[in-house]
Amino acid sequence: ICQRPKNKARALLWEFVGGKVEPGETKPQALIRECREELAITVSVGEQFMETTYSYPDITIHLTLFSCTIKEGTPKLLEHNDLRWITPDKITDFSFCPADRPILKRIMEENKK
């Protein structure tokens, strides 16, 4: 998980790595590009985990979450304030962006199985 920078909307809240899909890109291609731009890593994109939509007062965002593995590199803080590797049981220790809450709920449900 990554902590948003102080100078952006939803400052210092935690989120999953990602960003906008550019014209002509698939969602997996966008994720590969965003991981390279935000963390300087190359990932292999696996199965889609879930999709969700959330409306903030200023923007509506559509999130698609994929499982990924790092193929190359060590994550670096290029755009975020902080970075953490956590287990599902630690999710509640962090303040996430509201848009991520349905994803967190699903992760915790999956972890109970």
Name each region found by the language model:
Residues 16-48, 87:
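The catalytic Nudix box helix
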Residues 1, 47-50:
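A structural microfeature
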Residues 1-15:
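N-terminal strand-loop-strand
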Residues 108-113:
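Generic C-terminal helix-cap and adjacent flexible tail
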Residues 42, 51-74, 84, 107:
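Active-site-adjacent beta-strand/loop module that shapes the phosphate/pyrophosphate-binding cleft
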